[in-house]
Each structure stands twice: as C-alpha cells, then as structure tokens.
From Swiss-Prot:
Its cofactor is Mg(2+); Mn(2+). NCBIfam families: ackA, PRK12440.1. The record marks H179, R240 as: Transition state stabilizer. Catalyzes the formation of acetyl phosphate from acetate and ATP. Can also catalyze the reverse reaction. It comes from Photobacterium profundum (strain SS9). The keyword Metal-binding applies. This is Acetate kinase 2. Belongs to the acetokinase family. Keywords: ATP-binding, Cytoplasm, Kinase, Magnesium, Metal-binding, Nucleotide-binding, Transferase. The active site is at D147 (proton donor/acceptor). The lineage of its organism: Bacteria, Pseudomonadati, Pseudomonadota, Gammaproteobacteria, Vibrionales.
Length: 397
C-alpha cells in the first residue's frame, strides 16, 4: 500500500468534509462528509468505488468527535489506517500570523483560536475538528493549511483599506482574501496549459461557487483579490451580498435592525437567494431564468456583470495577461455563466469557442476561447490535493 496517503479534513461549524489523498497520483482514495451537526439527523456519508454509504450519528454528544471516530473506523475497515502518514487541515483565516503551512501544536491551536474574531463561523470549528483528529491519530503529524496564506504577497496598496491606519494597527483591519489554495492550484495548472513557467506568468483566477472570488496572480503570487477582511466582500455569491455601501448597515441599524439581523441578512439571505427570491443554487436560478422568472434573470445578470467587472479591473494589476481561469463548482460547470462573462469581456477581444466551452464541464478542463483571441480556460480545482501536498512537504522537510 502507498506510503503517500494524507487524510485531509475541512471542519466547519455544522459539517466536516474529509478525503484520503494519494499525494503521488493526486487521486482521492475515498471522500465523504459529516453533515447536520447539532441536529437530530446528523450523519456521515462517504463514497468508495462510486458507492455511497451513510452512518447516522447519535444525538448524545460531540458530533465532530463522533464523525472523526467513524472515519477512523472506516479506515480500519478498509485496512488503510496504518498507511496514512499525515493529516492536513484546511483553515479559513490565518490573519497575518500564518503565511505558510505549519505543523499543529498547542501553540498553533491557540493562535488559530485567537483569530476567531476574524472568522467566527470558521476558526472555532477548525480547532474543534483538529483536537478531535489529534485525539484519533495521536501518532501522526498534523498540519494547518490556510486559505489566507497565498494572499500574503499582496502589496500594501492592494490590502490596505482607505481608513485610519489606527484601525489596521489596533485591529488588523485589512484585505486578507480567501480561496487561496484554489487560486494557487489552478494558476499552476494553467501555466502548464500555456507551457509557460509559473514564475513568468500572469493570470486572473475566477473561483465561482457558493462562495466566489477573483484573484490577480503575477509570477505565481497573489497581487490582489476580491474577498477582503471577511469572505463577505467582493462578488455576489450564493447567499452573500458581496460589495455593498457600508452606509446601508447604519441605515438598517437606525431602522431598528439588530447587528445580528443585519449580518445574517447580508451573509445568509442575499446573493442569488436574495435577488432571485428562489434559491441560492446557481442551477436553479438559471432554470428559472430560462422559464422567464424576472428575479432569477436579474440575479444572473448581476452575478455575471460583477464577475466581468472584477476581471476587467484586475487587468491593471498585471503587466500582461496570459489567461482567465474559471474554477469552482459554478466556474467549472456552468456553461451559461461562462458564456455571459466572456460576452461582457468582448471589448478586450474575448471570443467564446462554443464547442470547447460546452465540452469543458464535469471534471474536464481546457481552453474555451477561439484560436488567436485572448485565452480563457477552465481548470478543475483540487484544494484537497494542495492541502495534502503541503502537509507531505512539511512532513519531509
């Protein structure tokens, strides 16, 4: 059995995703998810050889620990637990403290927890998952890989807000950016597509999913990105509003809304869901648009317009542009979304290759623009592979 297996864990407040990655092939030996933590129907499901299995968790305790325990049992049943050499954890927010992958110890756990003010929905849940994994795999080295780390190369003009420097000095208020592992991975894969060294390339990476962000990447490094202090800013998303005049927050507070109500509205009831009035799922919005639903049509138009606008604005961060990269669940699979974004960029010479664009879906990538026109391409992301590779590299450092 391979000695290159890394267990990758992404622990959220009410869920826990996991995958067993072979760092040589990049393939997931198995993957699954624990869902509905804190509810009566909490469960863990996984796929092996294309077949889905499910296990109901009990309602009498810590669902993160129960999920990890079930994963351990699953690995033992498959006879592969002993072949795992490390555990890698996704961490949403590393602030300015963590600029690269680190080995997890008690000090690191405390520092991640101390950053919870910057990611209150994510970092505490990461620590819960890490502690459960450490208890389950005490002999294995475990590593934290940060979404924000890739963006620590942004220049001050890109990450600094036009506010008093005291707010940055006292509270660390600045642009941090997210989806870093995804932007990192697809930019390296895109450089291979155009046969150019990553150190001499320039891309605009467009990660579109329920969460979405754009990143300008110069010579392999992030130089600007659309998400900011939190993952709420930037593009319109599944349930998040994206960029919004902050004066609206004061307006709603004066109208009697509580702070919690305002931010629940902006985080959970906006985006595709809020504008369409139907769903946060892009596929459902497009289906309704095709049936003539006005709210769905407007949601589609706002989303694609804002993505194109961000892409255009990030051209000024680069000396040249080798390609636009579409990735993430929507970016990899939604033909109508990509088509409309490219139409919006026609002033820059982008022309869709309809056959190639239709073909680049469901795990298949490639260039989707016509020959002799600026390049746009689809690159399926693989964040788990990045986390596994980063963990393996540090293990052998």
């Amino acid at each position: 059995m391979s000695n290159s297996l890394v267990l990758v864990i992404n622990s959220g407040s009410s869920s826990l995703k996991f995958a067993l990655i072979d760092t040589v092939s990049g393939e997931a030996t198995l993957n699954g998810i624990g869902e509905c933590f804190g509810l009566a129907d909490a469960n863990v499901s996984w796929k092996i050889d294309g077949k889905k299995h499910e296990f109901q968790l009990s309602d009498n305790g810590n669902h993160h620990k129960q999920a990890i325990d079930r994963i351990v049992a699953l690995l033992e049943e498959q006879g592969i637990k002993q072949d795992i050499v490390a555990v890698g954890h996704r961490v949403v927010h590393g602030g300015e403290k963590f600029t690269q992958t680190v080995k997890i110890d008690e000090t690191v756990l405390q520092e991640i927890e101390n950053l919870s003010d910057l990611a209150p929905l994510h970092n505490p849940a990461h620590v819960v998952g890490m502690r459960a994994a450490i208890a389950a795999f005490p002999a294995l080295s475990q590593y934290a890989v940060f979404d924000t780390a890739f963006h620590q190369t942004m220049p001050a003009k890109a990450f600094t807000g036009a506010i008093s420097s005291k707010l940055y000095d006292d509270y660390g208020i600045r642009r941090y950016g997210f989806h870093g592992t995804s932007h990192y991975f697809v930019s390296r894969e895109a450089a291979k597509v155009i046969n150019k060294p990553i150190e001499k390339s320039s891309f605009i990476s467009v990660h579109l999913g329920n969460g979405a962000s754009v990143c300008a990447i110069k010579d392999g490094q992030s130089v600007d990105t659309s998400m900011g202090f939190t993952p709420l800013s930037g593009l319109m998303m599944g349930t998040r509003c994206g960029d919004l005049d902050p004066g609206i927050i004061e307006f709603l507070l004066k109208k009697g809304w509580s702070t919690e109500q305002v931010f629940k509205e902006l985080n959970s009831n906006s985006g595709f869901l809020g504008v369409s009035g139907l769903t946060s799922d892009c596929r459902g919005v497009i289906e309704a648009m095709e049936e003539g639903h006005a709210g769905a049509t407007l949601a589609f138009e706002i989303f694609t317009y804002r993505v194109a606008k961000y892409i255009a604005s990030y051209m000024v961060a680069l000396d040249e542009l080798d390609g636009i990269i579409f990735t993430g669940g929507i970016g990899e699979n939604s033909l109508p979304i990509r088509r409309q974004i490219l139409k919006s960029l026609k002033i820059f010479g982008y022309r869709e290759d309809e056959v190639a664009n239709a073909d680049a879906r469901f795990g298949k990538g490639g260039v989707i623009t016509q020959a002799n026109t600026p390049i746009a391409m689809v690159i399926p992301t693989n964040e788990e592979w990045v986390i596994a590779k980063e963990s393996m590299a540090l293990l052998h450092a």
